[in-house]
Amino acid sequence: LTFTKIIDEKKSITTKKVLKRKYNIQRIDGLAESKVTPPESVYKRIKKENNAIGEARAINSDLQFFKEKFIMPVEGIISGVYGSQRILNGKPRWPHYGIDIAAKQGTMIKSSGSGVVTMAEDDLYYTGGTVIMDHGHGISTIYSHLENVLVSVGDQINQGDIIGTVGSTGRSTGPHLDFRVNWFQTRLDPMSVLN
């Protein structure tokens, strides 16, 4: 992977080696069938919601908030890790693109970094209560399965501000926060910006 930086017409090139990782397999059994394979009656809803999420992640603003060190949005136990293969009731599904942080229902969720809210929805099919924040130049964070969404689209949020509460909405098996980080449509390991 090569990065090129140009400052005052001086070009600097940095090369980083991308290492191969081994990902966990996470098996979850005993789920209601609707949590594993959604009924056809909700396919249009899911497609519309996925398009809206994609649009919120595609924003390329001039904000510079991505430069600050991000903080953990909620205290709890990490119960799901980035990249783990999900097998639901024996059926392989997409890898997990975030970290799950198990916490008590109603626990306050802080903004991991300063930014502007680009999505604030109470009830998406898969992710339930969902907030997406733009931190600049394609970097966004997603907070999912919220019981309460306490911000609105367009709000400018400071790092550490309360944006919602932990819940178990959408396709969820218990109270937790699914926290994700993206660079446009590329999913990043949230631990890479938290450490």
PLM regions and their residue ranges:
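Polar/charged, compositionally biased leader and regulatory segments
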Residues: T2-I87
